[in-house]
Amino acid sequence: MGPEEAIVHQDESMRIHRLLHHLDEPYREVFTLRTLGQLSFRDIGELFGKSENWACVVYHRARAKIKDKMEEWS
């Protein structure tokens, strides 16, 4: 990755980080556990006392919310 790409990547990371602070729970926690913690949906579901499917749905909703906000803020 060249210097320009690294800067773009860093800017994107900062935008996502700011957006995470605007997400409600459990979206923020599930998204963070999945992306940064690299936990499986099964493990995330167990942490919350929910199903694997619940964790998957919440994660994908969180991603959609982040994507929508990124488009709004662009």
Predicted regions and their residues:
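The N-cap/first-turn positions of alpha helices
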Residues: 26-27
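Acidic, proline/glycine-rich intrinsically disordered inter-domain spacer in sigma factors
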Residues: 1-21
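DNA-recognition helix of helix-turn-helix
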Residues: 42, 46-73
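A short pre-motif secondary-structure segment
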Residues: 30-34
